[in-house]
């Protein structure tokens, strides 16, 4: 959309008045001026007289209308953002205000509007009962429709078999290779209890299908992939496997055909004639996913154009009401249809919409703009507004728009549409639907921490909303042609009665979905003389190939299979019809009586804030599609940019400013964000003294009080979110969505660790380490910085924080918040500076009792070597908690949905300009789908916008500095010179291109490799490597990933559970993600941290982390923490039983050693290895946290009792033991039972540290321990933790012997959230 700058001269007094007024309403002066112009114009356009203005300045008439020639102005941060804020009319502002209105408020307002007058209510109930009775008792539909309906009712989504059918339907038809298709069929069918369905259905087809599935299931359930082919051939001859594949394929296609009118528009028009003769009308929908590339959007545009020509010719002049129409999805017409890309939508999508509408007008067929996700509603209204005022469309009433009754904004949208119809002098076609994205709306609000849901959480509230909205639509027949889309007999009957008996053609119509609503509407469409209601019904008819059908089909399966749907309940003969056709207003009032309040949300759907239960708040997010939130953010950002940000050393006593260095915005060198001064050696020394002196004071503070201070810090941080976003965007180059996520993560850390110490810690028993150094990275300069400090403070330690050199300003704000919350100044101190100076002085000091570090593997290794020779007062090694990088891979097989893969790859590889430890570095694509996936991925990359993150439109910001840019570009050039195909793409834009020259930008890059092993080290930036693999070589691929030595994150996209189990079971990786992106781990939901070269553990935001920051604690402490968590969520301890069998053998052997036997029992009870826990999280996601044994533990002792103590501890967790090959240990191995000795490996004592092991337990004196620590730290590769004890001690920390694995599965990946849809 083109823009023009118009200048106006104002005196200082007026300018100040504008500024003051804008500040008062939390808006920018720029917004206020724009809004004033907009409101005045609206008033002028809506009335014949000119609204009177207050007296203007006398000199106003002499002012020039021309804009003054702009002078070269200094860079003003966030001015672009402010200019992207849209003014709103009163009716549009009311829509935005109702976006996430509390349900109690929204439902209370609707009830009276929805209530039917008593006589109408009685008539509606009577008619609904008749319709439902006929529907239930009519002969089962014959042919394909009856077969499919029978299948769907028998296999509901609450059964494992129903979900299996849904997964099959979603994926089977798109898989190109037979091997993967067979694997999917085997996977979904082999575990089902098909036998329980035999004979339950009256339909012969369902019973035949069940026998077939049972037969198939029995064939495959006892065989794994390798032996399946042989077994099948043995049982049913050589044609067996193709026979099963063909049978299931046919069943899936049958289901597909039930819901699709035709594969082409010509076929669909031909198939429609039969029902058109019965009085039905049609609106055709061209199937497909939302466009991700320009090519996709162009293909959909052509498809729509061809369809309009075909429908128009078939309509043959019948007009918009009597003839067929078309429905279009705006997300199909543009790859970036979102609020953030507003200008592109208006400049590129709108002309396509206009062109299609003009084509529809040419044939006089109705064109409906389909409703989509809630964050697209208001931009779709802007497009509609523009369309309604096109001169070429004046006087034509074929423009249609779809509204969703489940949205709280719906009644206000109707008010706006009525106003729009009035202003544009036309009658609009408005289709009222209940809404098809309910489960994903719930999930998104929970994940984003928004203040509420845009939709109702109870179906009955949507039914009430539908009636209230229907009454509004029927009230203005001259302005609105209502189209009521419903399959619910009561809703249908209520509208029939409300609309009155004197129906006239063109008054209104009903609508239903092809393949779902015809049995109901055959009673409605037709003459009264034939016992029908003589009301028109238009069938919403999808058109497309079986491959394009998938996403649509799954939505239909979800709707039909959900036990709350009318279509599902009508078939359930145990449900009384009176209950089925109950008035929703009455149902809501009954609920209110039971619950004591009207409109309470569904008890099983907590508000986003309460997602984790009452013990911990979910951090609040910020909705970047909400115009009011954007305006408020814009005001705060402009204010933030005026602040003079500084980062000085923050010690117990204030320090002098001294000579400062500028902190430069990496996207814009002209923007000086603030100033920093490095801590001097003297200041570092002072800080160390203060940390030592204040440590006892802070430790003496009760845990509940420490927790309260951290909670206060979280609240303060959340209240300052907008200001913090401003610094993160300018100092760290974060986009707005990234900056919001960063503040939220910091808040989550504060809440999480505070909750743990409040509930589980006591000062008498949980003793801290002492002064702890926290060295944080620039890529998460607030989240990781706060997480480290919050954990150390929660555990009772004093903290010396050294932020990254590039990002000291946001760190200073973080410390200021902690101090304001009540942390004493000497307990937490900030020491800005370089690692080589400030970092080295801090970590090299003997008074430091622990080091927390996030950064490169190389620096972590140096730190470990630096502290290896130091022991604390108790003679224990100084702990290093290091979280380092990874060579993170994503494995994609041919059953994955390409569109989903591409969206997740873009987020995982290029979000934050690839500057996340967790970012995707190597994409592994199965051969059969590699070309197709890469084509779409390249197209999607070309749609990304790279530029200054201070604009809402930016997807990819800068890399952190010129050194990072040079390193990344060097790698890309090296790959080019090796002949590797390199693809770089980003959306070309002259404004962005100017910034690319001055800022430190690297375009998203795709590099194809021959082999995974070609990549030798992590490339920290927006560079994605691609390797192809053969399906049969998946085990070798996983071995290659493990061989890299890194183990931070790994993604897998597949619909096959066997593949998921194979990958997650054999990959040595800390955080695993299935069918979702692999970045953005959430505190307490996906505890984060790697293994091998990727980190030491424990995982940040997990239950073990705080225990690493204690010097002493009860041996049962961790068990207490886990038991509290286990009270809410089940524990799977199947693996534990298998792991502890050698321990049981040792316990029996120790019958004459009561002390050892007691230790075996104690360790066995406390051991948690082999346990898996479900963690809280958003709906549509399953998050588990598993504790596994470390592979091999080096145990060193010179006393038999200590050696056996170590052995008992290691066997309790299920690890192998590495012993020195000396007389003591050889003798023990001979004496031990074979079940135990099998777990022990001996190695020569002189080079034992050269052997592979991943943990160490030592008993002996401090000099020996020091030497051992130094020898272990000197090794290359993984940093290994050493536990050191005096002879005779038995308090071995079992959690140091665990590997933690987080697994996050997107359970809604197959197209919808079955468990949420069935909660009632």
From Swiss-Prot:
The active site is at residues 883, 917. It catalyses: L-proline + a quinone = (S)-1-pyrroline-5-carboxylate + a quinol + H(+); L-glutamate 5-semialdehyde + NAD(+) + H2O = L-glutamate + NADH + 2 H(+). Homodimer. Keywords: DNA-binding, FAD, Flavoprotein, Multifunctional enzyme, NAD, Oxidoreductase, Proline metabolism, Repressor, Transcription, Transcription regulation. Induction: By proline, autorepression and catabolite repression, and is potentially nitrogen controlled. This is Bifunctional protein PutA. InterPro entries: Ald_DH/histidinol_DH, Ald_DH_C, Ald_DH_CS_CYS, Ald_DH_CS_GLU, Ald_DH_N, Aldehyde_DH_dom, Arc_rbn_hlx_hlx, Bifunct_PutA. Residues 653-1119 are annotated as: Aldehyde dehydrogenase. Its cofactor is FAD. GO terms for molecular function: 1-pyrroline-5-carboxylate dehydrogenase activity; cis-regulatory region sequence-specific DNA binding; DNA binding; DNA-binding transcription repressor activity; flavin adenine dinucleotide binding; identical protein binding; proline dehydrogenase activity; protein homodimerization activity. It comes from Escherichia coli (strain K12). In the N-terminal section; belongs to the proline dehydrogenase family. GO terms for cellular component: cytoplasmic side of plasma membrane; cytosol; plasma membrane. The gene is putA. Its EC number is 1.5.5.2, 1.2.1.88. NCBIfam families: D1pyr5carbox3, PRK11809.1, PRK11904.1. It is an enzyme of class 1 (oxidoreductase).
């Amino acid at each position: 959309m083109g823009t023009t700058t118009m200048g106006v001269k104002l005196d200082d007094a007026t300018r100040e008045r504008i500024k003051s007024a804008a500040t008062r309403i939390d808006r920018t002066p720029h917004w206020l001026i724009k809004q004033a112009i907009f409101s005045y114009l609206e008033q002028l356009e809506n009335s014949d007289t000119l609204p009177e203005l207050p007296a203007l300045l006398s000199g106003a008439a002499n002012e020039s209308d021309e804009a003054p020639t702009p002078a070269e102005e200094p860079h003003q941060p966030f001015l672009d953002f402010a200019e992207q804020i849209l003014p709103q009319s009163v009716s549009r502002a009311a829509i935005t205000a109702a976006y996430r209105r509390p349900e109690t408020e929204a439902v209370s307002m609707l009830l009276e509007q929805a209530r039917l007058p008593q006589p109408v209510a009685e008539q509606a109930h009577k008619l609904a009962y008749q319709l439902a009775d006929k529907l239930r008792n009519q002969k089962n539909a014959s042919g394909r429709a009856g077969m499919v309906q029978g299948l769907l009712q028998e296999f509901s989504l609450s059964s494992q078999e129903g979900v299996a059918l849904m997964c099959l339907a979603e994926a089977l038809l798109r898989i190109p290779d037979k091997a993967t298709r067979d694997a999917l069929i085997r996977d979904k069918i082999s575990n089902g209890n098909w036998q329980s369905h035999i004979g339950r259905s009256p339909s012969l087809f369902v019973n035949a299908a069940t026998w077939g599935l049972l037969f198939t299931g029995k064939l495959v359930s006892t065989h794994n992939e390798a032996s399946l082919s042989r077994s099948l051939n043995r049982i049913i001859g050589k044609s067996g496997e193709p026979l099963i594949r063909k049978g299931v394929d046919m069943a899936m296609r049958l289901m597909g055909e039930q819901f699709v009118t035709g594969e082409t528009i010509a076929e669909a028009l031909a198939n429609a004639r039969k029902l058109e003769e019965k009085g039905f009308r049609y609106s055709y929908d061209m199937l497909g996913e939302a466009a991700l590339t320009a090519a996709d959007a162009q293909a959909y545009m052509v498809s729509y154009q061809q369809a309009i020509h075909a429908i128009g010719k078939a309509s043959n002049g019948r007009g918009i009401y009597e003839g067929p129409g078309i429905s279009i999805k705006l997300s199909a017409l543009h790859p970036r249809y979102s609020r953030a890309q507003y200008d592109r939508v208006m400049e590129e999508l709108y002309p396509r919409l206009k062109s299609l509408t003009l084509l529809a007008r040419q044939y006089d067929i109705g064109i409906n703009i389909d409703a989509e996700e809630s964050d697209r509603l208001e931009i779709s209204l802007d497009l509609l507004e523009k369309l309604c005022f096109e001169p070429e469309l004046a006087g034509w009433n074929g423009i249609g728009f779809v509204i969703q009754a489940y949205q709280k904004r719906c009644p206000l949208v109707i008010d706006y549409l009525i106003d729009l119809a009035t202003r544009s002098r036309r009658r609009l076609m408005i289709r009222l639907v209940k809404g098809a994205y309910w489960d994903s709306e719930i999930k998104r609000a929970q994940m984003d921490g928004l203040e509420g849901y845009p939709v109702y959480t109870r179906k009955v509230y949507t039914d009430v909303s539908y009636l209230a909205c229907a009454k509004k639509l029927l009230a203005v027949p001259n302005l609105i042609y209502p189209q009521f889309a419903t399959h619910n007999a009561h809703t249908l009957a209520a509208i029939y009665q409300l609309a009155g008996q004197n129906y006239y053609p063109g008054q209104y119509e009903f609508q239903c979905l092809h393949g779902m609503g015809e049995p109901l509407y055959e009673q409605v469409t037709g003459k009264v003389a034939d016992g029908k209601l003589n009301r028109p019904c238009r069938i919403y008819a999808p058109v497309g190939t079986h491959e394009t059908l998938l996403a649509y089909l799954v939505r239909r399966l979800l709707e039909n299979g959900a036990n709350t749907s009318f279509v599902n309940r009508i078939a359930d003969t145990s449900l009384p019809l009176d209950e089925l056709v109950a008035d929703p207003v009455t149902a809501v009032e009954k609920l209110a009586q039971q619950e004591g309040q009207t409109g309470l949300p569904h008890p099983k759907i907590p508000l986003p804030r309460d997602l984790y239960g009452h013990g911990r708040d979910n951090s609040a997010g910020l909705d970047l599609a909400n115009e009011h939130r954007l305006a408020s953010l814009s005001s705060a950002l402009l204010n933030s940019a005026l602040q003079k940000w500084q980062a000085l050393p923050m010690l117990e006593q204030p320090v002098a400013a001294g000579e400062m260095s500028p902190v430069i915005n990496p996207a814009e060198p002209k923007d000086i964000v603030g100033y920093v001064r490095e801590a001097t050696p003297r200041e570092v020394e002072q800080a160390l003294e203060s940390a030592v002196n204040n440590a006892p004071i802070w430790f003496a503070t009760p845990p509940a009080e420490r927790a309260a201070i951290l909670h206060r810090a979280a609240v303060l941080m959340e209240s300052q979110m907008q200001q913090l976003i401003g610094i993160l965007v300018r100092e760290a180059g974060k986009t707005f969505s990234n900056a919001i996520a960063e503040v939220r993560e910091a808040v989550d850390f504060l809440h999480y660790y505070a909750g743990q110490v409040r509930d589980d810690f006591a000062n008498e028993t949980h003793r801290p380490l002492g002064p702890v150094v926290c060295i944080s990275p620039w890529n998460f300069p607030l989240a990781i910085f706060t997480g480290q400090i919050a954990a150390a403070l929660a555990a009772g330690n004093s903290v010396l924080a050294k932020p990254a050199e590039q990002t000291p300003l946001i760190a200073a704000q973080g410390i200021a918040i902690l101090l304001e919350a009540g942390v004493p100044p000497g307990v937490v101190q900030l020491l800005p500076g370089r690692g080589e100076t400030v970092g080295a002085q801090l970590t090299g000091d003997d008074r430091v009792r622990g080091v927390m570090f996030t950064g490169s593997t190389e620096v972590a290794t140096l730190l470990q070597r630096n502290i290896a020779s130091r022991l604390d007062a108790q003679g224990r090694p100084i702990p290093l908690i290091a979280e380092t990088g990874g060579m993170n891979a994503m494995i994609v097989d041919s059953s994955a949905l390409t569109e989903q893969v591409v969206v997740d790859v873009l987020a995982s590889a290029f979000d934050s300009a690839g500057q996340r430890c967790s970012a995707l570095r190597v994409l592994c694509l199965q051969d059969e789908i590699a070309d197709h996936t890469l084509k779409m991925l390249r197209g999607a990359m070309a749609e990304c916008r790279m530029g200054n993150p201070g604009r809402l439109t930016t997807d990819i910001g800068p890399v952190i500095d010129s050194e990072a840019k040079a390193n990344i570009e060097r790698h890309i050039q090296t790959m080019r010179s090796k002949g590797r195909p390199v693809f770089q793409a980003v959306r070309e834009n002259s404004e962005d291109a100017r910034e690319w020259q001055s800022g430190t930008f690297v375009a998203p890059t795709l590099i194809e490799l021959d082999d995974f092993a070609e990549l030798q080290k992590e490339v920290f930036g927006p560079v994605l490597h691609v390797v192809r693999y053969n399906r049969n070589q998946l085990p070798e691929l996983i071995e290659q990933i493990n061989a890299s030595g890194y183990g931070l994150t790994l993604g897998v996209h597949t619909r096959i559970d066997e593949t998921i189990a194979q990958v997650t079971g054999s990959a040595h990786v800390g955080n695993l993600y299935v069918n979702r992106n692999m970045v953005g781990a959430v505190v307490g939901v996906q505890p984060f941290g790697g293994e091998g070269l990727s980190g030491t553990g424990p995982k940040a935001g997990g239950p073990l982390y705080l225990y690493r920051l204690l010097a002493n604690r009860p041996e049962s402490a961790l068990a207490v923490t886990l038991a509290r968590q286990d009270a809410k969520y089940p524990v799977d301890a199947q693996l534990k039983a298998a792991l502890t069998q050698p321990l049981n053998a040792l316990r029996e052997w120790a019958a004459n050693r009561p002390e050892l036997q007691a230790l075996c029992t104690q360790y066995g009870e406390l051991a948690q290895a082999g346990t898996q826990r479900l963690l809280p999280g958003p709906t549509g996601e399953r998050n588990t946290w598993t504790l596994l044994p470390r592979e091999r533990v080096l145990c060193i002792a010179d006393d038999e009792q200590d050696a056996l103590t170590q052995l008992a501890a290691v066997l309790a967790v299920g690890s192998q033991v590495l012993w020195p090959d000396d007389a003591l240990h050889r003798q023990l191995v001979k004496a031990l039972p074979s079940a135990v000795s099998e777990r022990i490996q001996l190695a020569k004592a002189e080079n034992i540290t050269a052997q592979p092991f991943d943990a160490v337990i030592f008993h002996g004196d401090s000099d020996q321990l020091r030497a051992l620590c130094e020898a272990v730290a000197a090794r290359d590769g993984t940093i290994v933790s050493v536990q050191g004890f005096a002879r005779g001690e038995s308090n071995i920390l079992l959690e140091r012997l665990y590997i933690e694995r987080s697994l996050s599965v997107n359970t809604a990946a197959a197209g919808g959230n079955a468990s949420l849809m069935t909660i009632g």
